[in-house]
Amino acid sequence: MSFVVGFDFGTKNCTIAVAQKGGVDVIANEVSNRLTPSMVSFGEKERYLGESALTNQLRNIRNTITNIKRFIGQEFKTDTVQEELKHEMFQSYEMDNGFVGYNVTYAGEQCSFSSEAILGMLFGKLKKTTEAFVNNPVRDVVISVPVFWNDYQRRAILNAGSIAGLNIIRLINETTATALSYGIYKEWSETDPTNVLFVDVGDSATSVSAVQYKKGQLKVLGTASNPNIGSRVFDETLVKHFAKEFQTKYKINVFENKKALIRLRQACEKVKKILSSNNEAPVSIDSLMDDKDVKGMIDRATFEELANDDMNTIVEPLQRLLSELQMTPDQFQSIEITGGGTRSTSLQKKLSEVLGRDLSKTINSEESVCRGAALQCAMLSPVFRVRPFAVNDVASYPVSVHFKSVSGVEQKLDLFNLKSAIPTPKPLRISFPVTKAEGFEIVVNSTFGTIATVKVDNIPAFTNKSSIKAKVWLDIHGIFHIDEVKLVEQIPEEETAAPAETPAETPANGEAAKPAEEKKVKVKETSLVFTTSRKGLTNELLKAAIEEEGRMQASDLLAIETAEKKNALESYIYDMRSKLQSSLKEYVTPADAETFMTQLNKQMDWLESEEGEDQTKSVYAGKLEELRRLGNPIQKRKQDLEDYPDAVQTLKNIASYVKNEAMIPGERYDHIEKEEKEKLCKDCDDAVEWIDALVAKQQATPKTQPCIINTTEVLAKKTQLEVTAKMILGKPKPKPVEVPKEEPKDTPMESKDAPAEEPVATKDQKMDDILD
């Protein structure tokens, strides 16, 4: 069975939803959490992904990559990236392509990774979590992205998916995914559209989307966002508040200690959640810094005062969207809030004040996006039948093209705006007139920079009116494409010689002669050879990243298996040392027990030594096998001696039952030969005699010796008796022989009216009459 999956890739956490015939399930990870941390950490032997990365973060700060979403597809020198890096603990650098890269220590070596490679590792973890849940390989997936993401970021996600071995069949905007999961199950009018406003406050960004519903479809009317502010600003506000308080009260500066700062941030995040349902919240951290335990308290009123400016910034996209659409809150049937940030009661209060109406909280703030992504995946999958529901989304960024020839001729053309549909229903044909056979460039631009540059070195010579044409479109991911660059020449068709005209009389009606027909034009198209350059990973770098990911996965698997073997060896030693003093004590001689215990202690000492701390999988496996050669015979003796009484009793029960069946008097088995029944009874007696002799011999044997009775052999004897009994006692009775009836002979002297003689009843007939 094919499974379709939706990933919600968040700044702090990821969620996974799987669409199956029974519906959409949000699945839990290996520690039963439905939220998987968006973290990747590098250790001495293996990588730690998701939950394990979070566990190792404080012990491995410099090699733990967090907030991956804030850097993927972002150029290193942008103000946004530089501001983000001020708060991070890991080492980053500018790659040759201008994007963000990471420097880490992995397996004792200095390694560098692109953002796509890091995200590919996280996606690989989500893929394995999903496969563990469905117990099948998973490949097709829809991944959510912020509605404001540009071309660079979207293509980076596709590359990360390729590195993870995923087939991303669509990148869906987060607010659109929420709108889909909200609307697909509801009944909408076919004629009267219904407007719903979605407010999504995430950890690091805020987005608002106005959606119109009609029967079988949704249409995004418009969106607005602030990419740089989300609920984490409340965490930072609380961090600054308590850092100042602790500096005054305890004389410590948490900003000077990275571990202390991380612990304080984690504590402040809990405070923020507590204040959502309580009027005050405490902070208590043991040994935060300089062996000092710290405590603090804050109430909701103080928090709202501190965070007031941040809340005003968060609601700004909402106000901006309503202004752009020239709509009022009353024109929406419902205003749905989603995202982890909307849990804050204070923020809800602020949103309600700005809108002048109540908010709706019917959406699961943490799972609506991944559910919508999984539904979209099911809708696009050929193996699922889903209720017809069209998703009409809009572009996330404007696109324009700039034509520049070698001689300096320039032309500009706007192609897509924020209201353009994605995917583009039909590719657009753009055209630029040319007058010279010379090379040119088509530069595709947007607000964030250059998307692509198409370059043609030269074009064929032409003599007629000509132009350059190209096909452009936005695909289902919201990514721009340009293709089929052609030279289009308009060639007038040659006129054929007209026959000599003879003088003709002017028509009587005085009509003038018809004017000559316009010359026909023939269009000649010539495909041009062009190169397209884009920012981001090249095909060579992507291929290398895929190969490197495969090697690292193999290394991770080996490290995990090695750790499992080491743990198995340690567990076996502890287990056997305990059992030799208890449950196995009576099954081993004192001398053998001492020898075994000596070996167990020796291996434990080796494990705890520097040599045993770091060994290969085969070494641990060999040590474990050596100990099992000593311990397995003891455990087998105990198991055999415990198992054989049940097997013996089972054999005796079967023998007794079969013998009693064979000796039942009466008609039940009277069709079976006496000799056969006697032989069956003898087989039963022989089996009992055989097992009694073995039991007597076993009872005279010490428990420290191997068990004489083979349980498997006893059960085989029982099965043999059952088969023999079935063959003999299961024979069907022969069918009674039918006596043919004699036809009555006609007697001339017999009168037809004479009464027929009643037949004399046989013994069986009389019995039948009685039974009736």
Curated annotation (Swiss-Prot):
Keyword Nucleotide-binding: yes
One Gene Ontology cellular component annotation held by this UniProt entry: cytosol
Domain of life: Eukaryota
Region (Disordered): 496-519, 729-772
One MF annotation (Gene Ontology) recorded for this entry: adenyl-nucleotide exchange factor activity
Pfam families the record matches: HSP70
Biased composition (Basic and acidic residues): 735-772
Compositionally biased region (Low complexity): 497-513
Gene Ontology biological process terms from the UniProt entry: protein folding
Family to which the UniProt record says this protein belongs: Belongs to the heat shock protein 70 family.
Cited function: May function in protein folding and assembly, and disassembly of protein complexes.
This protein's name: Heat shock protein 88
Organism: Dictyostelium discoideum
